[in-house]
């Protein structure tokens, strides 16, 4: 598995992925794709068999109450997985790293993420929630 980290997230997430032996992981900026629109980036993600990591969850999985109804992955029949890190507006690097670490622990438990989403969310009550589901829904 290799992660592609969205440009809205810290480059340090790549370092964490590499430390955890996901050595082919990279960042949108490092690959020269900075500024690409989501619809331009999606074919690159899919063709490269990347597991995409973003905080722009709604753009890729659609609304939280109806994932897959809209968003870049709504019409994708097969993908290498999507990791959504959900936190407050302007989430800092430390929180991004904490949420990504939790996602990596979830992947240690079950590494098969093909056609799945892992969402790690810092809820309003400061609890961390981990949600894993199929996308597209079966």
Residue map of PLM features:
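Extreme N-terminal starter segment of soluble prokaryotic enzymes
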Residues: 1-2
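Short His-Asn-centered micro-motif
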Residues: 5-7, 54-56, 85
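N-terminal first-folded block
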Residues: 5-48
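Glycine-rich nucleotide phosphate-binding loop and flanking beta-alpha elements
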Residues: 11, 59-61, 126
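Acidic, metal-binding active-site segment of PIN/NYN-like and related structure-specific nucleases
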Residues: 38, 45-67
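Mid-chain, well-packed structural core segment of small domains
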Residues: 60-102
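Charged phosphate-binding loop/patch that engages nucleotide di/tri-phosphates or the phosphate backbone
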Residues: 104-138
């Amino acid at each position: 598995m290799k992660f592609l980290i969205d440009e809205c997230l810290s480059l340090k997430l790549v370092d964490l992925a590499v430390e955890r032996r996901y050595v082919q992981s990279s960042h949108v900026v490092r690959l020269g794709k900075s500024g690409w629109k989501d619809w331009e980036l999606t074919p690159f993600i899919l063709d490269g068999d990347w597991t995409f990591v973003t905080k722009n969850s709604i753009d890729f999985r659609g609304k939280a109450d109806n994932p897959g109804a809209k968003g870049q992955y709504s019409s994708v029949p097969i993908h290498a997985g999507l990791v959504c890190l959900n936190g407050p507006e302007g989430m800092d690097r430390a929180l991004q790293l904490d949420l990504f670490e939790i996602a990596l622990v979830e992947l240690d438990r079950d590494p098969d993420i093909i056609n799945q989403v892992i969402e790690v969310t810092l809820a309003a009550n400061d609890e961390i929630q981990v949600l894993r589901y199929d996308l597209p829904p079966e």
